[in-house]
Amino acid sequence: MLIFILFVILKIILGVITEFCRIYLFALSIRVFLAWIVTINWYTQPYIVLKKLTDPYLNLFRGTLPLILGMDFSSMLGFLFLECVIKLLESIYIEIIY
């Protein structure tokens, strides 16, 4: 009975973490899309909140790839890493269910 309860708790925790990663990936997508729009003032609401939420994560990947035609593609590494984490969590979640 205790093992069953632990599996249920683990399943809930993994589900919450996976959904958080998906929401964060969506926020990153919005951030990168809005970065292409030149007229956005990042120091007004609601953009500053999005910037403060996503910049610490994106800063981990900045400078890892050289600029290509003046564009920074290091955020793609952030997307790729977060997608891999989501896939890993989903596979663990599926293994726990079955």
Swiss-Prot record:
Biological processes annotated in GO = chloroplast fission; nucleoid organization
Annotated compartments:
Plastid, Chloroplast
**Entry GO CC:** chloroplast; membrane
* Signal sequence segment: none
Give the family per the record: Belongs to the ycf19 family.
Could you tell me what this protein is called?
Uncharacterized protein ycf19
Coarse class of the primary localization is: plastid
InterPro entries under this entry? Answer: CCB3/YggT
The UniProt keyword set, sorted, is:
Chloroplast, Plastid
State if Metal-binding is listed as a keyword. Answer: no
Q: Does the keyword Chloroplast feature in the UniProt annotation?
A: yes
Q: Which Pfam families match?
A: YGGT
